[in-house]
Swiss-Prot record:
Swiss-Prot/TrEMBL catalytic activity: 3-phosphoshikimate + phosphoenolpyruvate = 5-O-(1-carboxyvinyl)-3-phosphoshikimate + phosphate
Family affiliation: Belongs to the EPSP synthase family.
Organism annotation: Salmonella agona (strain SL483)
Protein name (Swiss-Prot/TrEMBL): 3-phosphoshikimate 1-carboxyvinyltransferase
SUPFAM superfamilies documented for this protein: EPT/RTPC-like
The UniProt record lists the keyword DNA-binding: no
A GO molecular-function annotation: 3-phosphoshikimate 1-carboxyvinyltransferase activity
């Protein structure tokens, strides 16, 4: 297996313009495909997940052109639901941001489409979304294991009164919200359980509004969507920088700054993961906000005990930042780590122990006490981009760290290690 050993880093300084947000990129691509008119998407993320969405849209007859660096996409919308030319199978890798929204959108009209993916995708639950779509008339079969992909979709979604479980993944609600305006009937969506990752729903609502559709949101417990609507292209749309990707650089600034400045997000960003900067501030770093940037300056870091449900992806970065904080850090209400690219609670606990930390892994929390001195270890990444990027921070000590399968960062940030090296001064 390929590996990358990062030597100790004495200081991290400088600015980075962030690649586009994965969450925003794939939502914007799907809405542009469903919309009337031509959309120009700028700062689109060039990554595995986005390629899977683009390949799927192409197979569904959507025409687009990409710039040489794949960050500008000119896409001609279908002006309504997507239709397969015949029976079709779409391979979506491990891209949850493609699988969930497409599973809903392709239930409009009459299609026969199979959605499948990598082995890990077949372990990521989708039953709650399928249950909700069936309530709205969709005809869906499981082809292997009940409640998991692959799925066969045969259209039939008309809207109506629908319940969705919000406790596992906000992507299920996102998928329903984006599909409902194109259904022939009005849709009322009621959310059962505690809605996880609520800020991601705000991204969805914000983007739908950009494409000309507004819906009634009653305290995130009930959403009323008028049927028979159309999305309309906003013309040009700039994809924000990825706030989850910003977390590694901001944390590096907190641990070994200098000052690190990330551009492409700022105080006006629609992504909830910008709140990661508040957590670093609480730990002792100095944060400066601009409209289009966030800067972090080193501080003496101390442990925190916090509910992280609002920033589940960026919270992983706090788990490795905790190795540099005084005291025991506890991250709570993070059960949905278990249904991501890998079981991230198990993976994080396992790899933190390798570098010498004392770790308690709970059902929905993790407690981390740093060692007096970090140990060199080979870090398993579980084909999870965030594991690789989180554990790169171990090199901000006087100990090297070896990252196995470093190219897994291609899911969201293909040149992550080059960018980190560019801003680093070796010890």
């Amino acid at each position: 297996m390929e590996s990358l050993t990062l030597q100790p880093i004495a200081r991290v300084d400088g600015a980075i313009n962030l690649p586009g947000s994965k969450s925003v990129s794939n939502r914007a691509l799907l809405l542009a495909a469903l919309a009337c008119g031509k959309t120009v998407l700028m700062n689109l993320l060039d990554s595995d997940d986005v390629r899977h969405m683009l390949n799927a849209l192409s197979a569904l007859g959507i025409n687009y052109t990409l710039s040489a660096d794949r960050t500008r996409c000119d896409i001609t919308g279908n002006g309504g639901a997507l239709h397969a030319p015949g029976a079709l199978e779409l391979f979506l890798g491990n891209a949850g941001t493609a699988m969930r929204p497409l599973a809903a959108a392709l239930c409009l009209g009459q299609n026969e489409i199979v959605l499948t993916g990598e082995p890990r995708m077949k372990e990521r639950p989708i039953g709650h979304l399928v249950d909700s779509l069936r309530q709205g008339g969709a005809n869906i079969d499981y082809l292997e294991q009940e409640n998991y992909p692959p799925l066969r979709l045969r259209g039939g979604f008309t809207g109506g009164d629908i319940e969705v479980d919000g406790s596992v993944s906000s992507q299920f609600l996102t998928a329903l919200l984006m599909t409902a305006p194109l259904a022939p009937e009005d849709t009322i969506i009621r959310v059962k359980g505690e809605l996880v990752s609520k800020p991601y729903i705000d991204i969805t609502l914000n983007l739908m509004k950009t494409f000309g559709v507004e819906i009634a949101n009653h305290h995130y417990q009930q959403f009323v969507v008028k049927g028979g609507q159309k999305y309309h292209s906003p013309g040009r749309y700039l994809v924000e920088g990825d706030a989850s990707s910003a977390s590694y650089f901001l944390a590096a600034g907190a641990i070994k700054g200098g000052t690190v400045k990330v551009t492409g997000i700022g105080r006006k960003s629609m992504q909830g993961d910008i709140r990661f900067a508040d957590v670093l501030e609480k730990m002792g770093a100095t944060i400066t906000w601009g409209d289009d940037f966030i800067a972090c300056t080193r501080g003496e870091l101390h442990a925190i005990d916090m509910d992280m449900n609002h920033i589940p992806d960026a919270a992983m970065t706090i788990a490795t930042t905790a190795l540099f904080a005084k005291g025991t850090t506890t991250l709570r209400n993070i059960y949905n780590w278990r249904v991501k690219e890998t079981d991230r609670l198990f993976a994080m606990a396992t790899e933190l122990r390798k570098v010498g930390a004392e770790v308690e892994e709970g059902h929905d929390y993790i407690r981390i006490t740093p060692p007096a001195k970090l140990q060199h270890a080979d870090i398993g990444t579980y084909n999870d981009h965030r594991m690789a990027m989180c554990f790169s921070l171990v090199a901000l000590s006087d100990t090297p760290v070896t990252i196995l399968d470093p190219k897994c960062t291609a899911k969201t940030f293909p040149d992550y290690f080059e960018q980190l090296a560019r801003m680093s001064t070796p010890a």
